Amino acid sequence: MRLLGLDVGSKTVGVAESDPLGWTAQAVEIIPIDEEAEVFGLERVAELVKSRQVAGFVLGLPKNMNNTEGPRVEAARHYGELLEERFGLPIDYQDERLTTVQAHRMLVEEADVSRRKQKKVIDELAATLILQNYLDCHGKLCAKL
């Protein structure tokens, strides 16, 4: 069994998965979505749930730096509700403050990736960081693995 880590944006969802033991997170893919058209990519998530034996979801919670919750937190929670309704699997949330900044820094400073290429992988990397932080903190869903 694995956990899927999701970095939910308004146009894409970055996806990462844990290894079966819950020690490491690896990038999987980016799923295109369109919040305005209410297209959430759940068909692709369903394929991943089935093929990867998913036990639960960890969604990034993009809180503000002062710990308040803005509209993106509401959107992430709504996506979590959609997942729970569709799949009946447990959902947990991980504070994702600065994960995108950390991902950018990793891509630019450590990997010297061009801006054009960054756009293609930034959401996957952010999802990986969200899930790895969750696994490192032994979140409640880790017991499901």
UniProtKB/Swiss-Prot annotation:
A single Gene Ontology CC term: cytosol
Pfam families named among the record's database cross-references: RuvX
Keywords linked to the UniProt accession: Cytoplasm, Hydrolase, Nuclease, Ribosome biogenesis
EC numbers: 3.1.-.-
GO terms, biological process: rRNA 5'-end processing
Subcellular location: Cytoplasm
GO molecular function: nuclease activity
Function text: Could be a nuclease involved in processing of the 5'-end of pre-16S rRNA.
PANTHER family reported for this sequence: POLYNUCLEOTIDYL TRANSFERASE, RIBONUCLEASE H-LIKE SUPERFAMILY PROTEIN
HAMAP family per UniProt: Nuclease_YqgF
Name recorded for this polypeptide: Putative pre-16S rRNA nuclease
Annotated organism of origin: Limosilactobacillus fermentum (strain NBRC 3956 / LMG 18251)
